UniProtKB/Swiss-Prot annotation:
Residues reported to bind ATP: G73, L91, T104, R105, H106, R107, T108
Cofactor: Mg(2+)
Protein name according to UniProt: DNA integrity scanning protein DisA
Record's subunit section: Homooctamer.
Protein's organism: Clostridium botulinum (strain 657 / Type Ba4)
Catalytic reaction annotation: 2 ATP = 3',3'-c-di-AMP + 2 diphosphate
Domain of life: Bacteria
Family: Belongs to the DisA family.
Protein task: Participates in a DNA-damage check-point that is active prior to asymmetric division when DNA is damaged. DisA forms globular foci that rapidly scan along the chromosomes during sporulation, searching for lesions. When a lesion is present, DisA pauses at the lesion site. This triggers a cellular response that culminates in a temporary block in sporulation initiation.
Length: 353
């Protein structure tokens, strides 16, 4: 449910991640210091900009691309990256398209990308860097060792943030079972959950850019976060005003800047509490998050429970007969819910000690 802000960039990075045939060809050109200009796409709009060159129309191969890059012109690849269409071609984009690039190769790449929306790759001969353009996007591909170092640093930061989130959530769990949770406790948990998810998004981009070299980072990330996002969403469902859509609230929180996220009063307004003291306002959870922790309770049953009892404390105080009357809950499931909540409470109180 995260907003996919960099979806297009992530798709580009997947195509040219280390281990892919395209990246291998680009690395070969980079090592040879010949420079190069490649355009990915075979639409009529792209082919109209191609002037001269040789029609190749052969299977794509990293070694072929490397050899063809020794010539001055650009290389045109099919959009599925399976064929090399032509080489040593000149690209003639609209010269009125604004560009802030310097150097003929990069100016051409930027203009072609803006005009056609295709992926254009410029490899600098002197600076020895690979720059990718698509529409208004410009991205410089970095060496895997640099990305790996940054990913490891981000993982270390994530570990610390997850540890803080765990402490905040464990404290909230205790307060929820005692029914003395304050708005401050709830907002702190929501805030910390979003902070963790922002670091996760950054690491996911590194993993995408690392390709097959990012497997270990991916495994470590999966181990660290587990159900952080799901719990964060359930927190919002537990405490937002009943007339508000939790999905819209979650999107709003994702759209906050780092400074805005630190402002708990601003977060309070987003979940529907305006002008109330955060520390003194007691609020009760609906129970989505806690009941979700009980094994083998379907989501539709949780919805029915919350609709019937409105608050977690009412679910806990309900008799077996009252639970049995809820649609989707029989005698066995009523016992499972009562026993599950009791065990959860005992476990949380033990963890406190």
């Amino acid at each position: 449910m995260r907003i996919e802000k960099d979806k297009e960039l992530m798709n580009i990075l997947k195509i040219m991640a280390p281990g892919t045939p395209l990246r291998e060809g680009l690395e070969n050109i980079l090592r040879a210091k010949t420079g190069g200009l490649l355009i990915l796409g075979d639409s009529d709009q792209i082919l109209k900009l191609v002037d001269g060159g040789f029609k190749i129309n052969s299977e794509y191969s990293p070694s072929y691309v490397y050899e063809l890059a020794k010539m001055d012109g650009s290389i045109v690849l099919s959009s599925d990256l399976k064929k090399i269409l032509c080489a040593n071609a000149q690209l003639i984009p609209d010269s009125s398209i604004p560009t802030f690039e310097t150097g003929t190769r990069h100016r051409t790449a930027d203009r072609v990308a803006k005009q056609t929306g295709a992926i254009v790759i410029a490899i600098s001969q002197r600076r020895n860097i690979i720059t990718v353009y698509k529409g208004g996007i410009k991205y410089v591909l970095r060496d895997s060792s640099i990305i790996l170092a940054r990913a490891n640093q981000a993982l270390q930061t994530l570990e610390k943030y997850v540890a803080v989130l765990d402490r905040v959530v464990n404290n909230l769990n205790i307060l929820e079972f005692k029914d003395i949770a304050t708005l401050f406790d709830v907002l702190t948990a929501i805030q910390r959950s979003e902070m963790v998810m922002r670091i996760v998004s950054e690491i996911e981009r590194y993993i995408c850019e690392l390709g097959n070299e990012g497997r270990l980072i991916d495994m470590q990330l999966s181990e660290l976060i587990k159900s952080v996002e799901e719990d964060g969403i359930l927190l919002i469902r537990d405490y937002c005003r009943s007339n508000m859509e939790y999905e819209d609230i979650y999107k709003q929180i994702q759209g906050l800047s780092s400074e805005e996220l630190l402002n708990l009063d601003g977060l309070s307004k987003i979940i529907g509490y305006t002008g109330v003291p955060l520390v003194d306002t007691l609020i009760s959870p609906r129970g989505y998050r806690m009941i979700n922790k009980i094994p083998r309770i379907p989501s539709n049953v949780i919805e029915n429970l919350v609709a019937n009892f409105n608050q977690l404390k009412c679910v806990m105080e309900a008799s077996y007969e009252q639970l049995d009357n809820v649609e989707g809950i029989g005698e066995a499931r009523a016992k499972a819910i009562k026993n599950g909540l009791r065990r959860l409470r005992e476990q949380i109180m033990l963890d406190k000690v």
